[in-house]
Each structure stands twice: as C-alpha cells, then as structure tokens.
Amino acid sequence: MPMTLGYWDIRGLAHAIRLLLEYTDSSYEEKRYTMGDAPDYDRSQWLSEKFKLGLDFPNLPYLIDGSHKITQSNAILRYIARKHNLCGETEEEKIRVDILENQAMDVSNQLARVCYSPDFENLKAEYLEQLPGMMELFSQFLGKQTWFVGEKITFVDFLAYDILDLHLIFEPKCLDAFPNLKDFVARFEGLKKISVYMKTSRFLRTPLYTRVATWGNK
C-alpha cells in the first residue's frame, strides 16, 4: 500500500520530502490541500480532516505509512532516509547530517519570515546584505566533496538543494561567487530520478509559500 504525503498544494516544507520520495523510488500518493484566497485564506479543506487522521501532533506536512503516522518535516525525511541508509554511516557523517539538518531549517525559517512579512521590501534589502556570508558558510561546509556529508548522498543534500534553489529564485546571482555550490545544484538536478521527476506535471518548483505570503505565493 502506498504511503500518503499530505501538504498544501505548494512547494514549502514538502519539497525535500517529495524529492527524497522520488529519488528512493518510494510508492506514495499525495493529498494536496488548497488554501482559499484573500482576505479569508480559507483552510477548511485541511481543518476538516486535521483531527481525524490519528496524528499525534496534527500539522502539515504529514506522512502516513501503514500504522506509522508522522508529522514534522525533518522527522518525515529521517523516516524515509532510514529505510534507504541515507542518514550517514560514521559518527563524523552523522554529526555533519545533524548540523546541516538544523542549519537548513534555520535558514529556511529566516527566508520565510522575510517573505511572509508585510515589510517585505525593507527586510529583503537587509537579507540580501547577509546572503553572501550565509552562502559562504554553505560553500565552506561542502568544500570539495561531492555531497555535503561526503562522497555518498544523504537526506540533508535534499534539504541543502531546496535551500540553495529557494535562494536562486530569491536572488538569481547569489551562487555566482560559489562554484562548488553551483556544481552541487547541477549535480543534484542531474540525478536520473530527480531529473525525470522535474519534467513531470507533479513537480512543484513554485509557489514557494502559501497565499498569505507577501512574496513567493504564486
């Protein structure tokens, strides 16, 4: 029986999850919820089901795999990754996985705060000033490795790809000074299953965020 991934009909927190499900050739189907337009942003499609699914902490995204019912995007990623040994093998690799998992979430939240703010234009200018330093840290962490944890791909590469691609949409030149990050993005998009998925109608590069956002909501 296929797994069910539930989320809004946007990219958001499900992007890395969808990519990982495709890369691992997992059998899954999606339940995509639609949010209404302004000013009400009606969420009844989701709210009508929210407390009926047997989730411990009802939220989006969720993954249901038989008796396993999981919320929190990184918990979902780790669940899928454990099935395919994509969590790092040595202690050093696992440390790098843990660091990047949390760093990616921090950066994702920072960008989302800017994009959801009514003061978007002012916050964008401040964010762009910090962006080169932020990307430099990712570049240093990757170094000359093929993937962020070493020569074998792990689930945090899916998070890193999501973060880098988000920022390329936000500021298309943001990786110009970091050839290793540009190469990483190209290498990731060149993975056979990812490349095939990106050509399907199921693939959502945008909208980045829900309709409540000031930027990235289309």
Curated annotation (Swiss-Prot):
Catalytic activity: RX + glutathione = an S-substituted glutathione + a halide anion + H(+); 1-chloro-2,4-dinitrobenzene + glutathione = 2,4-dinitrophenyl-S-glutathione + chloride + H(+); (13S,14S)-epoxy-(4Z,7Z,9E,11E,16Z,19Z)-docosahexaenoate + glutathione = (13R)-S-glutathionyl-(14S)-hydroxy-(4Z,7Z,9E,11E,16Z,19Z)-docosahexaenoate; leukotriene C4 = leukotriene A4 + glutathione
Binding site for substrate: Y116
Origin superkingdom: Eukaryota
Keywords assigned by UniProt, alphabetized: Cytoplasm, Lipid metabolism, Lyase, Transferase
GO molecular function terms listed in the Swiss-Prot or TrEMBL record: enzyme binding; glutathione binding; glutathione transferase activity; leukotriene-C4 synthase activity; protein homodimerization activity
GO biological process: glutathione metabolic process; long-chain fatty acid biosynthetic process; nitrobenzene metabolic process; xenobiotic catabolic process
Its biological purpose: Conjugation of reduced glutathione to a wide number of exogenous and endogenous hydrophobic electrophiles. Catalyzes the conjugation of leukotriene A4 with reduced glutathione (GSH) to form leukotriene C4. Can also catalyze the transfer of a glutathionyl group from glutathione (GSH) to 13(S),14(S)-epoxy-docosahexaenoic acid to form maresin conjugate in tissue regeneration 1 (MCTR1), a bioactive lipid mediator that possess potent anti-inflammatory and proresolving actions.
Entry GO CC: cytoplasm; cytosol
Native species: Rattus norvegicus (Rat)
Alphabetized PANTHER family for the sequence: GLUTATHIONE S-TRANSFERASE, GLUTATHIONE S-TRANSFERASE MU 4
Matching InterPro entries: Glutathione-S-Trfase_C-like, Glutathione-S-Trfase_C_sf, Glutathione_S-Trfase_N, GST_C, GST_mu, GST_superfamily, Thioredoxin-like_sf
Gene3D superfamilies: 1.20.1050.10, Glutaredoxin (3.40.30.10)
Protein name in UniProt: Glutathione S-transferase Mu 4
Residues annotated as binding glutathione: Y7, W8, W46, L47, S48, E49, K50, N59, L60, Q72, S73
CDD domains linked to this entry: GST_C_Mu, GST_N_Mu
EC number: 2.5.1.18, 4.4.1.20
Chief place where the protein resides: cytoplasm
Complex formation: Homodimer.
All residue ranges annotated as the GST C-terminal domain in the record: 90-208
Family label: Belongs to the GST superfamily. Mu family.
